[in-house]
Amino acid sequence: MTTESDTVTDPVTTPVLHLVMGSDAGMAGGTDTTAIIADVDVYSLDSLNLSRVRGLIVNGNCDQIYLERRREILTDFVANGGRIAVMGHPLTDFLPDLGQWRKLQYSGPKDLAISAGSPHPVWEGVDPVDLSFRREVSGFYGRGYSQKLPDTAIVTNYIGRAGLPVDYVYRLGRGEVLVHGGIDLSVYQYDPNTSSRVFPQLLAWLAQGDGTDLR
């Protein structure tokens, strides 16, 4: 006998899913790029059919204790070739090799300035100055850094005078994990500068060539 709780949902029609807390997309404010991404309640993760999904975005306000209890689902997804982008401040080990987020001690804009690291398609053509200041205010992009990164991690952006990692990518099995230790990157999609490239390029990277080119 199959109960409602045992039922796996039908395959989704978008290559990327955005895990959010219920109807609350947090700072992300949702997205209108419906051809490639759909918002999904994180608490439905157990019943999702991920067989046709290529990428997941974990919203910065998601329940990380719940995610840690579903670590096997997330790990299998990446190990089998999927890609996950983690937004915000990872504080639990819901994926293998996640670095530890730490709050940055800062006193001014230079302590929060973003500088480019290794090249990556998500940040292609993006001026770090446009990430460092949003609406003439510093600190939107991030106010912390990550430590204890896996040996294979590639740091794509640094923060502050000391050049501490704020964004990094690492391989896990046949897939990849991208971690952005700050505000959800979708907030930049309508900004009037090069930072608007980040979110569509993130979606293109997560979709792995399956979906509309949003750049």
Which residues does each predicted region cover?
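A short, compositionally biased domain-edge/stem linker segment
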Residues: 1-8, 42-43
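Catalytic beta-strand/loop cores that center a nucleophilic Ser/Cys/Thr
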Residues: 5-13, 27-35, 112-195, 209-214
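Helical hinge/lid and interdomain linker segments adjacent to catalytic or ligand-binding clefts
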Residues: 12-98
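A glycine-rich, often tryptophan-bearing local segment used as a flexible ligand/cofactor-contacting loop or short
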Residues: 64-137, 198-201
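Glycine-centered flexibility motif
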Residues: 22, 82, 100-103, 175, ...
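Basic, nucleic-acid-binding surfaces and adjacent catalytic neighborhoods in DNA/RNA-processing proteins
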Residues: 203-208
